[in-house]
Swiss-Prot record:
UniProtKB keywords: Methyltransferase, S-adenosyl-L-methionine, Transferase, tRNA processing
Record-listed E.C. numbers: 2.1.1.-, 2.1.1.35
One BP term from GO: tRNA methylation
One term of GO molecular function: tRNA binding
Name by which UniProt lists this protein: tRNA/tmRNA (uracil-C(5))-methyltransferase
Function per UniProt: Dual-specificity methyltransferase that catalyzes the formation of 5-methyluridine at position 54 (m5U54) in all tRNAs, and that of position 341 (m5U341) in tmRNA (transfer-mRNA).
Keyword presence, Transport: no
NCBIfam families, per database record: trmA_only
Any one GO CC term of the record: cytosol
Domain of life: Bacteria
Family the entry assigns: Belongs to the class I-like SAM-binding methyltransferase superfamily. RNA M5U methyltransferase family. TrmA subfamily.
Amino acid sequence: MNLAAMDPTTYDAQLEAKRIKLEQAFAQFETPSIEVFASDPEHYRMRAEFRVWHEGDDLYYYMFDKALNDKVRCDQYLPASTLINEMMAALIAELKPNPSLRHKLFQVDFLSTLSGEILVSLLYHRQLDDQWRAEAIALKAKLSSQFKVNIIGRARKQKIDLDKDFVVESLQVNDKVFHYKQIENSFTQPNAKVAIKMLEWAIDVTQNSQGDLLELYCGNGNFSIALAQNFNRVLATELAKPSVDAAQYNIEINGIDNLQIIRMSAEEFSDAMAKKRSFRRLEGIDLDSYLCNTIFVDPPRAGIDPATLDLVQGYERILYISCNPDTLKDNLQQLYKTHKVTRFALFDQFPYTDHMETGVLLERIK
């Protein structure tokens, strides 16, 4: 974190610098003009994590500033949502005078939503007992007069949910509202308004699609649920069980009837498609019945592994969302031999950092 860089007056210049850097880095692929999707310059992050400092009777949040090489007190935090900032103040006021709730508390995590829900996780260097639970229940009751809040307590090999360990986000995407279960301690897009722009862009570039869609690394179904409207059927894979469970929940609450989630890794799915291995998890699913002309990938920072990249290259159209331009560039070295980049986007998920989220649509060269 570099707090000095978080200056809304410099936001536009910082975003333009990212665009230029991206354009230069991908010039060899003859990309079209970059479509740039800006963030709000402040209060854009829907989640935030803070360490907690104890100093006599005082108690406050802090972060480590790499530029200063020191901890920085954070009574408020410009990138965090307005809801998180409001909760930060209300929560610390309740924790300070409470010996049970503050004892060996070392971290607080916040997960907020545009829909108004917020989840607070309190992390401790001690085991949590019945007294802690009673005090946490009272804390939740008091905060609930102002917030739609749930509280979780965590310690080594211990997790206490007072009610539930998730929030439900609602995103207005074009003329539809999609609802997403977001689980504590699982991956979610941190910048909800930019996430909406990403979904709208993905829907736009896949309009008038033929056949079915295959998605790898689908997470909680964020993209596949929104894209289902553009395809006859969608087949999606995800390895993490909490994400698969959330995806199934999201499919149901959004009334999606043409989306099938399979719990397996991209590498395992590549083997299944190549008929190298059989999997019990695929019983009852006829892979050969899917006519997938389009594949959607949103891989981790490491990019796509070689075997999966070979699989991806076999599709007519490839929609690739990347959180790491370096590994995207590496993957394009192979994909560019058979496909042309026809759409290219920069999504500023993380203002005031070097991080760039990108999207490319590749279409097979005729």
